[in-house]
């Protein structure tokens, strides 16, 4: 392969407001497997990851901790690097948006865009979601909340700079049409097209209300808004706009940006629009993968449903966790993490299939041939079948990796491993060993098994980087044997094997599930206690003191007359039907009976409640609210349900007991 064959792959840069969890690890391990495989193919790879360290949330977290924002992120970034080291992540460069060279690049980019008229000063009036760091207009909100995360938004009114995203709407649509592989999976591309066609707004790219950010060089009271800062990392890390690195011409454009689906919009609309404005080449592909779910929802530290990858690696081994993430989750879709799935995958694939094949093969080689077997030609149909599977494996895995169907690549590898295990049962080496006349046939069988292990071991090196060398070692080979060009049957003439430790000891399922359940309960209890303490501290902090002591003026909503309040009709209603809407991930469509008639209510609570959780329950509604057309008039919502925000950013609903009649007035 020629020296100029390069491959540039990036993870999103992670927000270090707290330690990362297994969901973040999923993205990075997937990128690592792709990077390792490309290196095995002979590519000169640049694998970039890093941290996005500016913004309101970091500023607030640091203030709560009594340290500067830089001191706060320094501590978290150290844990991020430790985690990637633990998970055998082979990144080539780690960028921090607080690095001087990155800030220099961002300021040059911002200035260039301003001077050519693609950035202008204006006034932002709208809404801001702090957790998502996103700005929204009235029409984009869902039930008055952030359409991405469902949390409360804050009114924002400040002077700001804007990037002319709207200017590039037609070019973006043309990009998608002419480059159908630019956005993957296909469903995500359709979402982006719909978002643009509904009317693309210019993007706010500075904030005066946030102090922790890169200052606009010609107007320093304006720190840059997160996305211009964050997105530019993909080129600043290569030396664009700075003299720290000099790899831009070699590696840009990126071959693959891997991101979570929640930030795909910024990477496929704002980022290419910025690059168009800068007259720079566009990345070749952006892949928006799904979420790793637990207990039916996205992992969240505040809910207490996160999984610490460090604990998992300590208990089961790094490669077991890497394998689970890469094999279990359908790439591009959401996937579920459960303790049962993890243990069953380790036992069935790693301990039973792979581990048993290696241990049985090595043991038989030692028992029947003193540990040394040589190439002996196969003479039966099942030999040719196994040889064919071995010889065709690399092409299948390569196609899957190129298509980003990583679980399918592992399925192909393990199909050969499973076929080799079946081959043992079919050839019965222990029976062949009883007759000296079968010695050549016996050696041929064991050689076929060694070859199956060698070739699958080479390919597994991209996914299980500490296991593959162990496999080679037990086969009597060194690390140089992990050569993709040698993944053909017969490439290794002789094996001198020796027994080693079990690759993946089998786990007692019942015992382990009980242990993990206990640990889960402890973690949830700790999270609940922490949330309660946080809420109590916040309440105490905000509690009004006596006027003569504090002089604090607490602002409330304007008073209304008692007669006006009496006009609001509050009643108990029974949920008779409830379903998700195909058109919205946020809304539930409820059919409720208020004692007189059934009515339709649309409510933005789909993130926290499943339809089956609500059917048959009695809830409070505003019964005389004027009907409101929603979803472009397709539905009409005839009321509003009672719901409250929880301390952790969730949602709770007041349910009424059996002794409360449907239709009762709420006073």
Indicate where each model-derived feature is located.
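Secondary-structure transition/capping motifs at alpha-helix termini
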Residues: 1-3, 37-44, 65, 69, ...
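N-terminal catalytic cores of NTP/NDP-binding nucleotidyl/phosphoryl-transfer enzymes
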Residues: 2-76, 95-111, 115, 132, ...
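Structured secondary-structure scaffolds
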Residues: 2-49, 101-105, 149, 155-367, ...
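A glycine-rich helix N-cap at a beta->alpha junction
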Residues: 78-92
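Cys/His-rich short segments
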Residues: 116-169, 173
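Helix-rich, typically C-terminal accessory recognition domains appended to large enzymatic cores
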Residues: 121, 127, 328, 333, ...
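Intrinsic disorder at enzyme termini
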Residues: 468-564
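Phosphate-backbone binding interfaces of nucleic-acid-interacting proteins
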Residues: 540-667
